[in-house]
Amino acid sequence: MTNNIIQYCPWIDCNVGCDFCFVHGQPDVDKVKSLQYILSLLKLPEAREADGFGLIGGEFFQNQLSSPSVKELFYELVDRILDMTVERNLPTFWIATSLIFKMDKELLPLLEHIQERQLLDRILLCTSWDSIYRFKSRRAEKLWECNVLRLHELYPELRIHVETVLTEHFMNLYLEGGYDKWEFEDRLGVRVDYLEPNTGFQGIKNFVDRVPNFLAKRATFLRFVREVVSTWPAQDKMDFLNPRIRSNVVYNIEDGEHHRIGDRHIIPIAQQPTNHRIKYGYSDSDRTMEDDYKLLRDSI
C-alpha cells in the first residue's frame, strides 16, 4: 500500500513539554505567515494529486488559536482541505493533537464546525500515548484517556488514531505483560501504530543523558519482534514500521523555516537534504529498527 499523503506543519508551538520533544530548542515561525504559506501550497499540482492531507504540530488546541487572525486562517485552512477531500472523494483528513488539555475551548468548537458540514467522518484525529516521558503525571494520562472516551461519546463518527514510540521502556513493559495492543485498542476504541524513536534535533549524548531508557537497545527490539510482533495478524505485521502507511511529503519546520521533505516512502528523514542531525532507533547500534524489521518480517 502506498499513500501519497501530504502533511503540513503550521507551527511547532506546544505546551505539553514532553521530555523527548523532537523539536526541542527549535525556533518557531510566525503563525499568520505560516498559515498563509500553507494555504498557498494547496494550489500546487502536488496538492491536487494527493491522496490525502494532514496537519501536524506543535499543538493546535491549547490556546494556539487565541489570536482571532490565527483562528480565522486556521479554520480557512481546515475548510479548504475539507473542500478538496469532498471534491476528490478522499476518505481521510488527518489532524494531530496531544489531547492533554481541556477540549472545550478550541478543539470541540472546530469539531462542531466540521460536524455542521457533515464531514466529521472524514477526520482521523491523531494523538499519542507513550509509557515514558509524555505524561507528567498519572492525572495527565487520565485526562488523555477521558478525552479519548469523551470524543467517542460526543462524535461517534470521529475516528481516533494513536501513535506510540518504540522506546526501550515501552518494549520491556509489553514484554513483561504490562501492556497489550489489543486490550488498549479495544478499551479506548482506537487504532495504534508504532514509531521508531529518534533524537530530534538533539545530540545523541545529551539526549540519552536527559531521557534514559528512551532510545532502544537493538537486542530488545529483536526480542520484541520475535515474541510480540510475530503473534500479530498478517496485515498488522505488514503495517508495523512500514513507511508506506505514512505521509509521503511533509512540510516541516526546521531552524524557523519550512522545509519540504519529499519521497519519505523511499528516503528516510535522516537522509533528506536538509540538515536534520537525527539519530534513529538504537542507543547501541547504527542500524535502524526499520532496516532490521525489513530483514525479519518475512520470517516471523
Kindly give the residue locations of the regions a language model identified.
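Distinct, well-ordered alpha-helical segments
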Residues: 67-78, 102-115, 138-140, 173-180
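Cysteine-cluster motifs in flexible loop/terminal segments that predominantly coordinate metals
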Residues: 14-21, 274, 287-290, 294
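A short, N-terminal amphipathic alpha-helix
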Residues: 40-45
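Radical SAM enzyme [4Fe-4S]-AdoMet core and its adjacent flexible, acidic
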Residues: 119-276, 280-286, 293
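N-terminal [4Fe-4S]-dependent radical SAM core
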Residues: 1-9, 25, 46-49, 287-299
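Core AdoMet radical
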Residues: 5, 25-33, 48-71, 84-104, ...
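Canonical Radical SAM [4Fe-4S] cluster-binding loop centered on the CxxxCxxC motif
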Residues: 1-37
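Residue-level detector of alpha-helical secondary structure
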Residues: 39, 75-82, 86, 108-115, ...
